[in-house]
């Protein structure tokens, strides 16, 4: 860029030509002042054009630097919102602009929530090698797209299937998972009553079956008394069946 170098050269020339003459030849300047008459405003007339030239050079240099900075600095954009200037220029030249007189910005979406705004977008491309829209009738496209359901991406543990009755299935513990509603019926259901008896999953070492204080028993005073009575009767039967003293031990032996 010749602007700044030219400005520096002019400033250097002015300093070299003005300062040494005033310092080295003071007597010659006094003689010239004595010979020539005093003209008021002559120095100002010489200084003003110099300032104007310098000001013009500075403005030109600033303009060149500003244009260079604008071309050097580029704003970094998001990959999903990046504008393609070449396509805009080509569209302006051809006159093929999108809705609103400009290209529509495509927003980057989540892969599981990506929505096809135009269901025939893949068939609108005439240059595609697969199957252009001109080969397919409208009724075929309508029937084909109506058969394809719009499936929403769900969590693997909460994914619902069409063969299940409930639309949303909650992921459950492996020991409490019920796939079929019939499996939820406990084996304790009575045939005539039709009352569901929920079964609680217990620890294998703490599982109690038939205990008087269990789900089917009562832990009241009557239940405890009955339990104590059963235990006492069991001990009496054991004593009667196995006496400690046999009857032939009591009879004396005959000589």
Swiss-Prot record:
InterPro entries: TRH. One of its GO terms (cellular component) is secretory granule. It comes from the Eukaryota. Residues 235-244 have a biased composition (Polar residues). Residues 1-24 form the signal peptide. The modification Pyrrolidone carboxylic acid is found at residues 154, 172. Functions as a regulator of the biosynthesis of TSH in the anterior pituitary gland and as a neurotransmitter/ neuromodulator in the central and peripheral nervous systems. This is Pro-thyrotropin-releasing hormone. It comes from Rattus norvegicus (Rat).
